[in-house]
Amino acid sequence: MTLTVHQFPCLSDNYGYLVRDESSGRTACIDTPDAAAILTELGRLGWGLDLVLNTHWHADHAGGNAEVKAATGCELLGPAEVTGRFPVDRVLAPGETVTLGETEFQVLESGGHTLGHIAYFVPSAGAAFVGDTLFALGCGRMFEGSPAQMWASLQRLAALPDATRIYCAHEYTASNARFALAVDSDPAVKARAEAVFAARERGEPTVPSTLAEEKATNPFLRAPRLRPGLPPHEAFAALRSEKDGFRG
């Protein structure tokens, strides 16, 4: 079976994702950051839309739900926290599986950025759609969750196969790279940062990355090494606090 991932930029720094199970022709959209952009891409590709898979309740992830559903008739799926804010037809919980044709999406708990944030892992495609939990060389701010919750979510993602492609929701990588360079002198971090800066100079995306790259260079996954002597979630919290105030 084959899953085609169509990635496109939208809003100021978001990425939209249309994913198509080629065996059935069924298509899903990961989040609805920009309804107009999503509908334009669907029209350009000649695809219909069957499902929306929300990761969390923020408007740049679920704000297009109503317009996209009205235009396509798709089914809206997402975590309970989206309900009451934006339309949802079916509430998903961690541990569930969503089927798109022959492709299975495993629903993973990934709270911390928001309390009920979820991610989607597609074993057959070696892909994870992680919303605002894990970024290339970074992670999401904790608007609602605790450091312990966010650290547990990051460890859950880090347990996926190393070859997993990480599709995050924003192009924040250059900024994240500057912070990584400030806190980690590992040569692998320097090499990756240089590659990121060069890619952005060429106008190229830095997403997706692989989980192996993140485990080797992402300071938030390396927090216990970078802040030794602290419990892992406290080491993570210290780095996240530094990043929140970083102006590099």
Regions found by a protein language model. Name each.
Residues 1-48, 119-131:
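Conserved beta-strand hairpin/beta-sheet module of binuclear metal-dependent hydrolase folds
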Residues 7, 18, 97-123, 127-128, ...:
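Core dinuclear metal-dependent hydrolase active-site scaffold
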Residues 12, 27, 34-109, 126, ...:
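Active-site HxH/HxHxD metal-binding segment of metal-dependent hydrolases
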Residues 19, 31, 56, 68, ...:
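Divalent metal-coordination and catalytic microenvironments
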Residues 122, 130, 162-173:
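Anionic-ligand binding patches
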Residues 138-164:
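Active-site-adjacent loop/tail segments of enzyme domains
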Residues 155-165, 174-248:
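Accessory terminal helices/loops
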